[in-house]
Amino acid sequence: MQLEIKVALNFIISYLYNKLPRRRADLFGEELERLLRKKYEGHWYPEKPLKGSGFRCVHIGEVVDPVVELAAKRSGLAVEDVRANVPEELSVWIDPFEVSYQIGEKGVVKVLYLGDSEASGTPELDKEIKSSFNPDAQVFVPIGSQDSSLSSSPSPSFGQSPSPTFIPRSAQPITFTTASFAATKFGSTKMKKGGGASGGVSVGGSGAGGQQPPPQQPRMARSPTKNLLKHKSLSLSMHSLNLIPANPAPQSQLSPNAKEFVYNGGGSPSLFFDGVEGPSTSTTAPFGSGGASTCNSSSFDVSQVFGGGANSLFLEKSPFVEGLSYNLNTMQYPNQPFQPVVLAN
């Protein structure tokens, strides 16, 4: 009886898989098996298989068998859902050594299982059912039938291994090589969007690093003239222009290739201030040629560069003056009187 009930349940449940929740369909099969076994007690006649065949028939259609309604209710399914997903007017006869079905009132009765009453033989499946049988129904095993006697019985589906069980699919493990793992994001299996090898070696288009980042623009070195242009006022002091007499300066450490022009402090007594008399003593040019005592003829006149007049130094600034913001107190000659020098390469 257990084998015949299992064949009928696999056939009915095959229509519910992939249409209703799988867990609900399994519960429906378990409840229906339990109710059918209880119903067939005392009405199973192996010596007379056709006796009580109408009583053991399970019908699902316009009129649903009360056993099916109770099993659907206990499993949380609506009877309308069960009836809508099975063929119309489905009738299944569960008899000793034979299970058959009929679709429609005038349909042909086909055999699902036919056993030998004298010797237990392998089940025979209808060719049409074998080709159209839902493969998901093969793995349906009611909980109550998972005993040793049922596990040794053949399965009605395709005559394969008895009592198939649910086997979850194992996911394929993800493997990485050292190079491919280094090219992935930290904590993820996705590849980096762009990358290059360490040490400044860039990865090619076919490498594992992916796309190359855009080349960075070379950073411009900060020029000292940038700070010079910020401050447009001259920070010239009385001491730096040698207006106050000081000791003679030692030999300059400037490059001998530079052209040096020495300003004579007594050349223009009223260079910055009207009516202010400057010192009359002339300073010898340490870099003058032939040991000249004065630099009136060879020295560079600052007033000519700054506009020519005494009062035009701060009133009319030429482009040369605007870009000139040397702080002469911070030059490399802190202990020497300043000699204004213009370098030209």
UniProtKB/Swiss-Prot annotation:
Q: Give the record's GO CC terms.
A: cytosol
Single GO MF descriptor: nuclear vitamin D receptor binding
> Which Pfam families does this entry report, sorted A to Z?
BTG, PAM2
Annotated Low complexity bias: 144-164
What are its GO biological-process terms?
negative regulation of osteoclast differentiation; osteoclast differentiation; positive regulation of ossification; regulation of gene expression
Alphabetically list the UniProt keywords.
Phosphoprotein
Residue ranges of region Disordered?
144-170, 188-225
Q: Which InterPro entries match?
A: Anti_prolifrtn, BTG-like_sf, PAM2_motif, Tob1/2
Residues with Phosphoserine modification:
S255
- Biased-composition ranges for Gly residues? 194-210
**How would you summarize where this protein is expressed among tissues?**
Ubiquitous.
Superkingdom of this protein's organism:
Eukaryota
Job of this protein:
Anti-proliferative protein inhibits cell cycle progression from the G0/G1 to S phases.
What family does this belong to? Belongs to the BTG family.
**Complex and partners:** Associates with CAF1.
Annotated protein name in UniProt: Protein Tob2
Q: What is the lineage of its organism?
A: Eukaryota, Metazoa, Chordata, Craniata, Vertebrata
Gene behind this chain? Answer: Tob2
